[in-house]
Amino acid sequence: MKKIFVLSVVVLLSFVTLANAGIKTEEIEYSHNGTKLTGYLAYDDSKSGKRPGVLVVHEWWGHNDHARNRAKMLAEAGYTALALDMYGSGKLANHPKKAGEFMNAAFSNWPDSQARYNKAMGILKEHKTVDATRIGSIGFCFGGAVSIKMARGGADLKAVV
């Protein structure tokens, strides 16, 4: 019985490994007005040709694993995704009060936030796997508001979720 269990686990893990074999991820460092920003790029390296790019805008907590995992999921679905960093300098909130402060600061200085978003979009558009004419943006909470605000402001986006 133990051998069957171990064999089952090995087979299951091999399927998981094969499913993610072509997914490449990398941290992308960039800056705006002296603030260090760190994005997270994910794409399927086993596929050839250009594909749509998707900007993933984090929640009000900051650039965390949730946004990175969404980028990986999008890569598995055939997109190239960049989870961008709207706050910079590794800012992460662990309490709603702090998250609200970060979010309010981003919206209070919208031109700066818009420039950070556009900087990330430029990086995504230049990636070797991306069809720069097919860019979308998704976000959750704060990120959804940013995506919509950018689209309404005329950003070069084909889709917003």
Predicted features by range, described:
Residues V6-V16:
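Bacterial N-terminal signal peptides
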Residues V10, F102, A106, K149:
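Generic anion/oxyanion-binding catalytic loop in active/binding sites
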Residues E27-T129:
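Serine-hydrolase catalytic machinery in alpha/beta-hydrolase-like enzymes
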Residues S8-V9, E76, A155:
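A periodicity- and composition-biased signal for non-globular, repetitive helical segments
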Residues Y117-V161:
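Primarily recognizes the serine-hydrolase "nucleophile elbow" in alpha/beta-hydrolase
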Residues T17-A21:
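Sec/Tat signal peptide C-region and signal peptidase I cleavage site
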Residues I23-T25:
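Short beta-strand-initiation
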Residues M1-I4:
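Positively charged n-region of N-terminal signal peptides that target proteins for export
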